[in-house]
Amino acid sequence: MKFREPLLGGSAAMPGASLQRACRLLVAVCALHLGVTLVYYLAGRDLRRLPQLVGVHPPLQGSSHGAAAIGQPSGELRLRGVAPPPPLQNSSKPRSRAPSNLDAYSHPGPGPGPGSNLTSAPVPSTTTRSLTACPEESPLLVGPMLIEFNIPVDLKLVEQQNPKVKLGGRYTPMDCISPHKVAIIIPFRNRQEHLKYWLYYLHPILQRQQLDYGIYVINQAGESMFNRAKLLNVGFKEALKDYDYNCFVFSDVDLIPMNDHNTYRCFSQPRHISVAMDKFGFSLPYVQYFGGVSALSKQQFLSINGFPNNYWGWGGEDDDIYNRLAFRGMSVSRPNAVIGKCRMIRHSRDKKNEPNPQRFDRIAHTKETMLSDGLNSLTYMVLEVQRYPLYTKITVDIGTPS
């Protein structure tokens, strides 16, 4: 029996011998690669020493060959995009270290500087997102809502249902930047049950309206006659200590809107929000009515010297406010009667909030008193500031009627 001849001419060696030689060559290449890697590791960033470590002598400084011919210092190997290390000096002073990546974020600049090993500008931090402005009309609105006051309200549950509301009743939209920085001011005394309903209904509404808002409950201390307008002035000044609000909504604690298209924000003219209350048969009681819930921008509020401080007891202050706006050439804007519907929590009149017998006389003299009675004559003392999960409560002493 004959063996077959080899497929290739020349050597009669078995095919395994060629494979063995290839393996030896591969091992040699790997060893060379490992050696070069070790040299780089020992040399660190000082690449000037690399030729000496591998046994290569650099050309003379005057030579026109090698590195000098392409404009690099002699004896230096330079990687693309890497700046050269500083020259070695015969000095006992320590060399200054090259800036690290941490330095680049601590002292941001236009791009990589000398000595940097970055080939491009550092990547910005991903913790800050570039958000666009919220739309003029929120896409989250649902329209008409059923408002009921015959269910018990647990504020712990309300807190759980509004996890994005921060301590003190602050909320900022997460997916856009709201131009409406709204402080909602509630004049208050002994209305805790009403406040529960207000917080239960209004927090979801205000979030759907994509407002950057805070809730401030201004609590009148003591047992003297209630003064709604003065408490609103206090709320204006105290809220501005927290944040740069540009809009102020002044709301009674017992009024709830029935349509979330009735936005709690400011417009080019002062805004009357509670235009169709169930108390008045869902209609406006009279054209000059400005009570319940209203909104004024910071500039509008300052231009009328705020609200009057001398209306102790019930009634009159909202008509005085309307007169102030008219005397400053402003007109009141309102939503239509369908969107502007509101429900009021029924209750008996509070003690120390009886009708003010002087209200009609004071309303008749608004033009003479508005320059001296308002923000520029406001006096009060803050007794306590309490930051609750759903609102900020500021208890104040506003004095007694003079």
UniProtKB/Swiss-Prot annotation:
Annotated binding of UDP-alpha-D-galactose, by residue: 187-191, 226-228, 253-254, 314, 347-349
What tissues express this gene product?
Detected in milk (at protein level).
In alphabetical order, the GO MF annotations are: alpha-tubulin binding; beta-N-acetylglucosaminylglycopeptide beta-1,4-galactosyltransferase activity; beta-tubulin binding; identical protein binding; lactose synthase activity; manganese ion binding; N-acetyllactosamine synthase activity; UDP-galactosyltransferase activity
Reaction catalysed?
D-glucose + UDP-alpha-D-galactose = lactose + UDP + H(+); an N-acetyl-beta-D-glucosaminyl derivative + UDP-alpha-D-galactose = a beta-D-galactosyl-(1->4)-N-acetyl-beta-D-glucosaminyl derivative + UDP + H(+); N-acetyl-D-glucosamine + UDP-alpha-D-galactose = beta-D-galactosyl-(1->4)-N-acetyl-D-glucosamine + UDP + H(+); a beta-D-GlcNAc-(1->3)-beta-D-Gal-(1->4)-beta-D-Glc-(1<->1)-Cer(d18:1(4E)) + UDP-alpha-D-galactose = a neolactoside nLc4Cer(d18:1(4E)) + UDP + H(+)
Q: Which residues are glycosylated?
A: 90, 117
Q: Show the CDD domains listed in the entry.
A: b4GalT
Q: PTM comment for this protein?
A: The soluble form derives from the membrane forms by proteolytic processing.
Q: In which pathway does it act?
A: Protein modification; protein glycosylation
User: Composition bias, kind Polar residues: at what positions?
Assistant: 116-130
Superkingdom is Eukaryota
Q: What residues form the membrane-spanning segments? A: 25-44
Which cysteines bridge via disulfide bonds? Answer: 134-176, 247-266
- Subunit field text: Homodimer; and heterodimer with alpha-lactalbumin to form lactose synthase. Interacts (via N-terminal cytoplasmic domain) with UBE2Q1 (via N-terminus); the interaction is direct.
Task: Specify the protein name.
Answer: Beta-1,4-galactosyltransferase 1
Q: Which gene encodes it?
A: B4GALT1
